[in-house]
């Protein structure tokens, strides 16, 4: 007897007439008047459950099988046969059923076999992966992460693990979570009455990282092509469908590369992972198209087959000002593009992914390379139809004097960035990179409108349950 995942049986990788055991949970049980029960058994290995046909001659049919409800865990042994019913090619003619775990009170089981609102599912995040929606999201999240790793590996990049605890504010925005072991009821103070962080665990102020970029740059200046992929944190009090306090970021860094190199990498990477999603998760994508967003599959296919439009920020502003459409947020040179501006450019004007380059320096971070005009920096955003910004990046400032000037302009203490400045002192090179918010990528591929529903246990303002 062999044990097989449901996906192997449904996809014909287990021979017809062979005996096999599957382990999983009951999605539904249906009883016929002829004394036969049909169990839909799922194990999470694919979207569809496996139908197990159970005759009433099994010794535990009356006492156990007829009491199985949604969520019960079972081990089903039987013979693989061609299915006569619609919806699956194969089913299991059960010869033995072992009940592993019952649902204590089926009437109060939070995941009863009915549709639940997405808001309700967030309240039971420990059980929501049992639903069709969140299970499909979890598999897609895995597929996209694996595709990203595969893409970078195949293209000669090294994965670098950057620290989650840091002293550097990469974005210079100050929206950071503090890490401390000090007694909040008895804080040590300096002579000036300020908190004495010298007595803290790290002997200084420390925070959860907002980006692995600065550390990634250090390794790019030794290994040439690297990427970081891990959790990042923003203490931003935003209750929107696009923001999380804890989320995952993918950040490649390329030495000897300019802004155009970063744009090319972004295009190749996105098309690679979207192809992987279509090839590897067809069943889940079909569900998303039927239940979440009817355009998910066609949107991905169109994205893959589109050439990215390339435009300067200044030209983008001119397009928005002259398009004749009214926006909630005003459009003028120097403003950061809002989501409605981004989506107009990608969905209406170009009807394709857009790379917007060379933004005003005053709305971008200190590390972005100053352009010759003295007003803009070599920054880029990739705008995708259906979501707006999906990637943000730049060519990094490799000139020490220009970096110091930007730090001073933004009121940042250059001594706090001493090691980052060292990279410019010892064999500096032009280098570029970008950041991809992983949850936004998952949301884009699945059509799920809120990023809280594409991460297992969302962390948002006033919510850190589970």
From Swiss-Prot:
Its main location: cytoplasm. One of its GO terms (cellular component) is cytoplasm. Pfam families: tRNA-synt_2, tRNA_anti-codon. Its EC number is 6.1.1.22. GO terms for molecular function: asparagine-tRNA ligase activity; ATP binding; nucleic acid binding. It is found in: Cytoplasm. PROSITE patterns: AA_TRNA_LIGASE_II. This is Asparagine--tRNA ligase. It comes from Photorhabdus laumondii subsp. laumondii (strain DSM 15139 / CIP 105565 / TT01) (Photorhabdus luminescens subsp. laumondii). The gene is asnS.
């Amino acid at each position: 007897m062999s044990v097989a995942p449901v996906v192997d049986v449904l996809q014909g990788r287990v021979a017809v007439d062979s005996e096999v055991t599957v382990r999983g949970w009951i999605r539904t049980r249906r009883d016929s008047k002829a004394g036969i029960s049909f169990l839909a058994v799922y194990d999470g290995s694919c979207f569809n459950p496996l139908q197990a046909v159970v005759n009433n001659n099994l010794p535990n049919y009356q006492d156990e099988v007829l009491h199985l409800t949604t969520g019960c865990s079972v081990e089903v042994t039987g013979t693989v046969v061609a299915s006569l019913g619609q919806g699956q090619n194969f089913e299991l003619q059960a010869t033995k059923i072992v009940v592993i775990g019952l649902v204590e009170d089926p009437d109060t089981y939070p995941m009863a076999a009915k549709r639940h609102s997405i808001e309700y599912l967030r309240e039971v995040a420990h059980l929501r992966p049992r639903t069709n929606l969140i299970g499909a999201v979890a598999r897609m999240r895995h597929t996209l992460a694996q595709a990203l790793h595969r893409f970078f590996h195949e293209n000669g990049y090294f994965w670098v693990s950057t620290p989650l605890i840091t002293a550097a504010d990469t974005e210079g925005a100050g929206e950071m979570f503090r890490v401390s072991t000090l007694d909040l009821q008895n804080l040590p103070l300096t002579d000036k009455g300020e908190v004495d962080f010298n007595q803290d665990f790290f002997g200084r102020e420390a925070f959860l990282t907002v980006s692995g970029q600065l550390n990634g740059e250090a390794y790019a200046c030794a290994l040439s092509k690297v990427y970081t992929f891990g959790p990042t944190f923003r203490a931003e009090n935003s209750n929107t469908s696009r923001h999380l306090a804890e989320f995952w970021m993918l950040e490649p860094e390329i030495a000897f590369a300019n802004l155009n190199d970063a744009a090319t990498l972004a295009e190749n990477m996105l098309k690679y992972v979207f192809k992987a999603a279509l090839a590897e998760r067809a069943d889940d994508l079909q569900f998303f198209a039927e239940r979440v967003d009817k355009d998910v599959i066609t949107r991905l296919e169109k994205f893959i087959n589109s050439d990215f439009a390339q435009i300067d920020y200044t030209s983008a502003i001119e397009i928005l000002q002259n398009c004749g459409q009214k926006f909630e947020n005003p459009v003028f040179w120097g403003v950061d593009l809002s989501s409605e501006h981004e989506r107009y450019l990608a969905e209406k004007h170009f009807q394709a992914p857009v790379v917007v380059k060379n933004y005003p320096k005053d709305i971008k971070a200190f590390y972005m390379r100053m352009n010759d005009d003295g007003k803009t920096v070599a920054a880029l955003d990739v705008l995708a139809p259906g979501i707006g910004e999906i990637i943000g990046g730049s060519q990094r400032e490799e000139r020490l004097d220009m970096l110091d000037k930007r730090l001073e302009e933004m009121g940042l203490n250059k001594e706090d960035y001493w090691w980052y400045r060292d990279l410019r002192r010892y064999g500096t090179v032009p280098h570029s990179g970008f950041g991809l918010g992983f949850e936004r990528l998952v949301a884009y591929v699945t059509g799920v409108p809120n990023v809280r529903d594409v991460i297992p246990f969302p962390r948002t303002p006033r919510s850190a349950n589970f």
